[in-house]
Swiss-Prot record:
The lineage of its organism: Archaea, Thermoproteota, Thermoprotei, Sulfolobales, Sulfolobaceae. Transmembrane segments: none annotated. It comes from Saccharolobus solfataricus (strain ATCC 35092 / DSM 1617 / JCM 11322 / P2). This is Large ribosomal subunit protein uL22. InterPro entries: Ribosomal_uL22, Ribosomal_uL22_CS, Ribosomal_uL22_euk/arc, Ribosomal_uL22_sf. The keyword Ribosomal protein applies. The gene is rpl22.
Length: 157
């Protein structure tokens, strides 16, 4: 496996909690927009927002990879963008890594109500190549793309 490190942040190690999930079977395109939307939010606010998107009460704005994304009327005006979607599979994976980071924070003795998402990012993971049989003895390559999600929570006063 390739070497990998968390980004270096100028914060006290006793005030942060980290979590990572690797080789998630999810597209980097959806994860990028989910991570961008919740970066800098309080942990509880981010989880509430993601649950509202899962219930399709609010759309997630798509800044990048938004070709074909229609304008949604239930996007908040604070995003200053109209294109949005409901990437449910990506949100479930991000909620999973947020729960893991929250458990790490409580294990460290940090106050959960004061946690903000200091860093969250999705990176490309491994790509699995498979073959789909076709007519006349041919085969077509199929690619299964994966992603890695990393999160750092910081306790603020």
């Amino acid at each position: 496996m390739a070497s990998w490190k968390y980004p270096q942040l100028d914060v006290d190690e006793l005030k942060i909690a980290k979590a990572v999930i690797r080789d998630v079977p999810e597209s980097i395109r959806d994860l990028y927009n989910v991570c961008k939307a919740i970066r800098g939010m309080y942990l509880n606010d981010a989880k509430d927002f993601l649950n509202r998107v899962l219930e399709e009460k609010e759309a997630l704005p798509f800044w990048r990879y938004n070709k074909g994304a229609s304008h949604k009327s239930n996007i908040s005006a604070k995003w200053k963008i109209k294109a949005g979607r409901y990437p449910k599979k990506a949100i479930r994976q991000v909620l999973k890594v947020l729960e893991n980071a929250e458990a790490n924070a409580t294990n460290k003795g940090l106050d959960v109500d004061k946690l903000i998402i200091r860093h969250i990012a999705a990176h490309k993971g491994i790509t699995l190549q498979r073959y789909m049989p076709r007519a006349f003895g041919r085969a077509t390559a199929k690619y299964r793309r994966t992603s890695n999600i990393e999160v750092i929570l910081e306790e603020v006063e």
